[in-house]
């Protein structure tokens, strides 16, 4: 009973208060900043900007704690069964975010809902609940929470577009970093971690819980395919940007000639 109370006080309550406070106060803060800079703050921005900022907060906290948990905290003896207090907290934190985002995206579906996010959030919530909650595959799950490191770049891209800064050099740099981040972390890093467990870890061949092979054989391919789709979409966007810029420069040069 005491353990449950501690979990509520030191994990559930802070997570709930953080996301609730951000949801309540961020729109007002952003509106003040926008008005001071003579930027319109209409309905879409009132909904999307706070949502993106909260997404960024979640990504920074989750990825930073995941890096610490994976590389600066020697607890991983068995990649499929080892757990730590930090890994449990990370899954609790990101679960609260996904629940929050799912509710907000459903309520403001006109602006926020996408089928890709619905699929991603559903798979993530089921994995963190049934695997993470049972103390299974924390190492593998952390390799995914770590890849949230790319999310702030995606949100920055949205902010730059929304502020009409598509021609700013930062927009190009940001797009390239997103592409590299997705390929490096969301595709290769997670795949390398998964293959290491399957082929190099002795615990996989003797694992008896059916959730482990289900995660590796179904969840991992589904998330990877989704990440590959997003990577393709990003690369297509970058290619279109450079092609358009090149054509525009040629048109200007021809006019000058």
UniProtKB/Swiss-Prot annotation:
Keywords: Membrane, Transmembrane, Transmembrane helix
Cell division is among the record's keywords: no
Sequence ranges assigned to domain TLC in this UniProt record: 44-243
Coiled-coil residues: none
SMART domains per UniProt: TLC
InterPro entries listed in its UniProt record: TLC-dom, TLCD
A GO CC term attached to the entry: membrane
Primary residence: membrane
Superkingdom of origin organism: Eukaryota
Pfam family, any one: TRAM_LAG1_CLN8
Sequence intervals crossing the membrane: 14-34, 53-73, 88-108, 112-132, 169-189, 214-234
Topology term for the membrane: Multi-pass membrane protein
Subcellular location field: Membrane
Gene Ontology annotations of biological process type: lipid homeostasis
Family affiliation: Belongs to the TLCD4 family.
Name under which the protein is recorded: TLC domain-containing protein 4 B
Gene symbol of the encoding locus: tlcd4b
């Amino acid at each position: 009973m005491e353990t449950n109370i501690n979990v509520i006080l030191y994990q559930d309550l802070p997570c709930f208060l953080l996301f609730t406070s951000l949801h309540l106060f961020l729109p007002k803060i952003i509106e003040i900043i926008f008005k001071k800079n003579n930027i319109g703050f209409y309905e879409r921005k009132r909904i999307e900007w706070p949502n993106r900022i909260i997404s960024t907060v979640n990504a920074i906290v989750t990825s930073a704690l995941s890096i610490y948990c994976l590389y600066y905290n020697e607890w991983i003896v068995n990649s499929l069964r080892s757990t730590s207090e930090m890994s449990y907290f990370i899954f609790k934190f990101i679960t609260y975010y996904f629940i929050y985002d799912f509710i907000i995206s459903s309520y403001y579906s006109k602006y926020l809902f996408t089928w890709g996010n619905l699929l991603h959030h559903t798979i993530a919530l089921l994995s963190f609940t049934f695997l993470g909650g049972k103390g299974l595959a924390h190492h593998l799950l952390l390799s995914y929470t770590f890849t949230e490191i790319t999310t702030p770049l995606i949100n920055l891209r949205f902010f730059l577009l929304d502020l009409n800064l598509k021609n700013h050099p930062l927009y190009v740099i940001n797009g390239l970093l997103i592409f590299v981040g997705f390929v490096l972390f969301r595709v290769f890093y997670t795949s390398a971690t998964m293959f290491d467990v399957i082929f190099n870890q002795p615990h996989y061949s003797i694992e008896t819980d059916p959730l482990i092979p289900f995660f590796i054989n179904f969840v991992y391919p589904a998330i990877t395919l989704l990440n590959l789709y997003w990577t393709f979409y990003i690369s297509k966007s970058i290619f279109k940007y450079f092609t358009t810029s090149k054509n525009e420069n040629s048109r200007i040069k021809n006019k000058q000639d």
